[in-house]
Amino acid sequence: MFTIDYNSYRTLEPYGKRVRFLVLHYTAVDFAGSVKSLTTGAASAHYLIPDPTDPSYRAAGFKGQKIFSLVAEEDRAWHAGVSQWAGRSGLNDTSIGIEIVNQATDVGGVFTFPDYQTSQIRALKQLARNILQRYPDMTPKNVVGHSDIAVGRKSDPGPKLPWKELAEAGIGAWYDEAVKGKYLQQFSDEMPERAQVIQAFSRYGYGVETPASDVFFRALVRAFQLHFRPENYDGVLDVETCAILYALNEKYA
């Protein structure tokens, strides 16, 4: 039996942590259903943030806001599925997933997005800041929604997640209003060509099709709007959406 010496020498660089993305989700079911699907089903996530007003949460004997750890961060959770971001695919291997209990619905493509509880957002801020402190590769652009990395397939965490508020708390990306205004003025005269816009989406991190079908392009625009222009996520590339995209690339890309 040979002894492994863990102490005499340690590599300082080059090496990096496996985890570089933080992916936010909603569960689309109540607490009881969320726990069942995430602990006994095919899906899993590292953390679950319940809704303390959920009757099934209280029925389970809990009260007040909690955060549940379901999978150790060093282990892979099955939350991202078929996914792409920043030139990488299959993000289960390189991400931490946070599921938030929120009973959003999709009935034949018609969505309802309930508000998140204030305590859930406070819990998310606490948890996300703690995670970000430990993973330096989680840059603002690498804090994403499931809809960002699974364009056309997923809509979570939906337009009710306060991404701007999170960014102001140091979690994720947001654009500068002044830079957005600059591009609003520029694009009010002439919008970029569609191929240029697709390139801009790719530059920011989105997985794109080249050439992009009309269906995919609309889904791509909608995914972006769900995150950065939640007041209107109709999938139509208008001047404001384009200005926000270019403002983000100027700030982060």
Descriptions of predicted regions:
Residues 251-253:
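C-terminal extensions
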Residues 54, 60-61, 71, 147, ...:
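Generic detector of bulky aromatic hydrophobic side chains
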Residues 1-137, 141:
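Active-site-adjacent loop/helix surface patches within enzyme catalytic domains
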Residues 109-212, 219-233, 239-247:
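Basic/polar, cationic surfaces and motifs that engage anionic cell-wall
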